[in-house]
């Protein structure tokens, strides 16, 4: 089985999407952008900040951080006050977190 090495350019950073640490960094950057976006409701920005802190906690394993963050993001994804562009970002973030191995 051939494994593809995908890279992703995000705000000038070259990220290796096969590396879970780089995927966590990408998620943190996405969450930071959401927390700074004034068009997103305050409660969703607060969850983005809390999720960012969970992903930055290096005391836990990468898989546990990803699973915890995914749970938090999933909880807020059904918020009826969320604008469409924010919901799209949430789905992209969830897809990235799901690609990180939990074990």
From Swiss-Prot:
Coiled-coil annotated spans: none
Any one Pfam family match given in the protein's UniProt record, by short name: UPF0147
SUPFAM superfamilies named in the record: Ta0600-like (SSF158436)
UniProt similarity note: Belongs to the UPF0147 family.
Protein name: UPF0147 protein Mlab_1361
Source organism: Methanocorpusculum labreanum (strain ATCC 43576 / DSM 4855 / Z)
């Amino acid at each position: 089985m051939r494994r593809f090495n995908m890279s992703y350019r995000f705000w000038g950073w070259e990220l290796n999407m096969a590396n879970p640490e780089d995927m966590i960094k990408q998620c943190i950057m996405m969450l930071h952008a959401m927390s700074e976006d004034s068009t997103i409701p305050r409660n969703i920005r607060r969850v983005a900040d809390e999720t960012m802190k969970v992903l930055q906690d290096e005391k836990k394993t990468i898989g546990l951080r990803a699973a915890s963050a995914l749970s938090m993001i999933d909880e807020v994804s059904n918020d009826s006050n969320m604008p469409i562009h924010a919901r799209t970002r949430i789905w992209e973030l969830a897809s990235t977190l799901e690609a990180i191995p939990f074990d």
